Amino acid sequence: MKFLAILSLSSSALATISSIQLFAKSDDSKVDGLGLYSKHEGAAIDYLFLGKNGADLKYDDEKKQIFQELKTSSITVRQSFTLGGDVYELGATDNFIPVTINKDGTLSFTGDDKVYASKNVNDPYRYSESEYAVSNKKTDDSAPITIVAKFSDDKAAETSGVAQAASSSAGPAQASVSNFEGAAGQNKLSYGVGMAAVVAGLVM
């Protein structure tokens, strides 16, 4: 039982939350290289559009969850990457789309082979009449895209859940940084000293 508890704690402690931005890769020069950002379209619902810069987002590598934080006076809610109708969005939902970020930065998820930059998607505020929405639907003005993540090298990854509790209660943690090549270089925190102390405490 102690052995299983140690394995479970170790797995949770290695999970990280990284800062990322998303960009479109396409053979169509009109949309290639544009960043994904969100616009309010409803209650805790932000549709994803293409613009000059990508929005600052987070990636939970344990849950495979891309999200941004919506902060109110009393709570903080994760608005997660999901599909609302024909348009990809950031929504306050538990039914988010699990995403794997590959070493080359490309995103793998269910439906990733049919992603388009599309205008005129009939969004509530009609932003798509002048801007490209990220959609799974072709319209009269569409271009196929691949979504690529870029990790923010200047922002250290934040540890989640148990890792924070372990490092704070067991003393200073020893961090090491490893970077992938290209767009997928990401900052990972590896908790050595803190985890060793916690494991020792469990065994004793």
From Swiss-Prot:
Signal peptide positions (record): 1-15
Biological process (GO), any one: fungal-type cell wall organization
Record has Signal as a keyword: yes
Bilayer topology: Lipid-anchor; GPI-anchor
Keywords: Cell wall, Glycoprotein, GPI-anchor, Lipoprotein, Membrane, Secreted, Signal, Virulence
Localization: Secreted, Cell wall; Membrane
Any one annotated GO CC term: fungal-type cell wall
Main location: secreted
Disulfide bridge map: none
Record keyword Cell wall biogenesis/degradation present: no
Induction remarks: Down-regulated during yeast-to-hyphal transition and by fluconazole. Induced during cell wall regeneration following protoplasting and highly overexpressed after treatment with micafungin.
Post-translational modification (record): The GPI-anchor is attached to the protein in the endoplasmic reticulum and serves to target the protein to the cell surface. There, the glucosamine-inositol phospholipid moiety is cleaved off and the GPI-modified mannoprotein is covalently attached via its lipidless GPI glycan remnant to the 1,6-beta-glucan of the outer cell wall layer. O-glycosylated by PMT1.
GPI-anchor amidated glycine: lipidated positions: G182
Disruption outcome: Leads to a significant reduction of cell wall mannan and to decreased virulence with a diminished induction of host pro-inflammatory cytokines.
Domain of life: Eukaryota
Proregion residues excised on maturation: 183-204
Function: Component of the cell wall involved in virulence. Does not seem to have a major role in maintaining cell wall integrity but plays a role in the relationship between C.albicans and the host.
Entry similarity comment: Belongs to the SRP1/TIP1 family.
Record protein name field: Cell wall protein RHD3
Organism of derivation: Candida albicans (strain SC5314 / ATCC MYA-2876) (Yeast)
Source taxonomy: Eukaryota, Fungi, Dikarya, Ascomycota, Saccharomycotina
